[in-house]
Amino acid sequence: MTLKEEFPVLGMGCAMCAARVEQALRAQKGVAQATVNFAAQTVLVQYDNQACTTSQLQRCVQAAGYDLVISDNAAQAEEEAEQARSKQWADTRNRTLLAAALSLAVWSIQMFLTPSLPSALLMWLLTTPVVAWCGRSFYANAITQLRHGSAGMDLLVATGTGVAYLYSATVLCLHLGFGHGTALPHLYFESAAMIITFVLAGRLLEARAKSHTTDALRTLISLSPHTVTATDDEGRTWEKRIQDVSVGDLLLAKAGERIAVDGSVTSGTSCVDESMLSGESIPVDKEVGSRVYAGTTNLQGSFTYRAQCVGNHTLLAQIIQMVREAQGSKAPVQRLADRVAAVFVPTIMSLSVLTLIAWGLLGGADGWQRGLTAAVSVLVVACPCALGLATPTAITVAIGRAASEGILVQDAAALEEACRTGAVVMDKTGTLTTGHPTVTRAQWNGDKALLGPVLMAMESRSTHPLAQAVRQYLTDNRLTLSPQSAVLTPDTCSTLPGMGIEATIHGTAYLLGNRRLMEQRGIRLDEPLAEACRQWESEGHTIILLADGQEALAILGVADPLKATSKEAVDQLREMGIEVHMLTGDNDRAAAHTAHEAGIGNYAGNALPADKAAFVKHLQSQGKHVAMVGDGINDSAALATANLSIAMGQGSDTAMNVAMLTIIGSDMRQIGRAIRLSRTTVRIIRENLFWAFFYNIIGVPVAAGLLYPLCGMMLNPMYASMAMAMSSICVVANSLRIRGRGSRQA
């Protein structure tokens, strides 16, 4: 069986490390695809569990010089990886502090003491632990990379500092043996020490910054409680581990507690904060029969609920898995960075050697000395990490931000595609409207306190959606009981197919149905009711009439009302320069009314599923990137045809499976927010890539000595390493801006 799982990876230090892990896994038998998210330090693997096991995947990664965290529980694997990273971070911090103290001493000797043999020996003594202990990971990783035929950032740092240290130690030893009476040679101990210090400090800051890119995912994971209060029909309660909860268990939700699993309320009422799912801050009322979801918060009162979805089947678990997979995917814009990163280190190594040779041959008397300085600077100024982090950090932050606002992104490509949207096509029913027939108009030709219970009696046994709408209206308006507080029961009741219901209640015959039934039975409709019929029908309402044997007694108008956020959402899209179209299978009159209410000028009714897909293609033929928003099976063809497919989370599974973006709640404004988030993310990715390329394009020539003929300036390797460390930190920091801007700003 083919599985898709995400695993934490330990030991990756740069983009080349990520590429090496990908290559190792893709070469493993049974692995169809492997995608590393360097920013999140994870790998998404699609593999056949009959052809290879997770242990084989782990051994494969370990053979490449890294480690894969394997666990039966995703949360446990993440916790183990986090513990390992925390331990590694603490070790790096300790080595950085020691390196900083020793390097500062070496730098002070170099700057303030007169060059002498004792000062040179002291610098050698202080630099040795910096190189041998503080910087040991660079050399160990470099050796591993060479052994496996790869090259990464550690190889550049190890080569640069190793050359500086070994050269200085060698010439100092030669001076001790053969240089008595001669001038002390130029030494690079402070360069070797400071390079390691700055790179370690940069890694430390970068790791802390990168940890914030997955804050949203960690927040989602933390929403699930570890224990839950179980109960039984006799009211006894006991604590239960979340892993031990089974479908059908009766659970108790106390005020202020998080709900443990998805279920249905069996007793009690409350209101629940579902903002973590839908992004909507207004609490949702819950009563018997209401659905509740894992991770949401019970705000007041207590209620019991029956577990329906547990473990990885809860909505929260599915959201977490979707966010993991999306964060692990690669955006198309990342391909250029990947191609450059693949040849980056060999190219820099070659340029460093050429720099040394060019200075040695053309630089005059001290050409080789300057050449060594320039060669080391070239090695340490170059930064493939900035290129490797440019896209995944922004994608990871953006997808996490989207999830926290109730927007699920299928993959990075969807996020990139959304920014190009020029036209949005919306379905009407369930997308712009609530999808639930509701009585929105009522006019009575008699005492409604007497007629309401009659209506309730006639509709009480019907399962028709219109009957449900009428019952809900009567219940909400307290019109279900007679003045004697009794529930009326029909003496006789029969269905008239296509027209309505005929019933006798307390000896009086009643009709309930459409205008055709009234006309067929010769029921008189006085002018106020007739005018109301005409007016409401022009607004797209379905008309229901109640009559006795002679005249109409009441008229109800049933409609699918517009969602409260639909008009604002349409206005926002238009302000963003996006065309808005509406298509519906309803008649033209209903389509026109809804479009007018929503402020949509382009609409069409009587549209079949094939018509919707054809309309999307028509817009695409005009060169427009089209987003389709739908919620039902009849929208799936158009969703699949569109450049960007958006499903409303309360719709069908078919629509959500096809969609690239899913809006969990019913807030239509999330569509504009998703597009704004995409625009912000793509802009920041471009900024990151520009600065990463610009930094290397400018930094490498300057390090090689390009400015020396113009102004006599050579880039000190110490400052080159500082610039390299800052380049990665700046890329991560720029990506983290999405957390503060995201979907709220264009």
Task: Please state what every model-predicted region is.
Residues 1-119, 210, 219, 236-239, ...:
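Flexible metal-binding regulatory segments at protein termini and peripheral loops
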Residues 2-3, 19, 505-507, 547-687:
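Conserved ATP-binding TGD loop and adjacent catalytic N/P-domain core of P-type ATPases
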Residues 29-51, 55, 186-189, 218-313, ...:
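Conserved cytosolic catalytic loops of P-type ATPases
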Residues 62-80, 120-123, 127-227, 231, ...:
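Actuator/coupling domain of P-type ATPases
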Residues 97-105, 335-363, 375-383, 388-393, ...:
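Bilayer-spanning, highly hydrophobic alpha-helical transmembrane segments
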Residues 103, 466, 476-593, 608:
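Signature of the cytosolic headpiece of P-type E1-E2 ATPases
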Residues 112-116, 147, 166, 401, ...:
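Membrane-embedded alpha-helical bundles of multi-pass transporters
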Residues 277, 336, 373, 383-458, ...:
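Conserved catalytic phosphorylation-site environment of P-type ATPases
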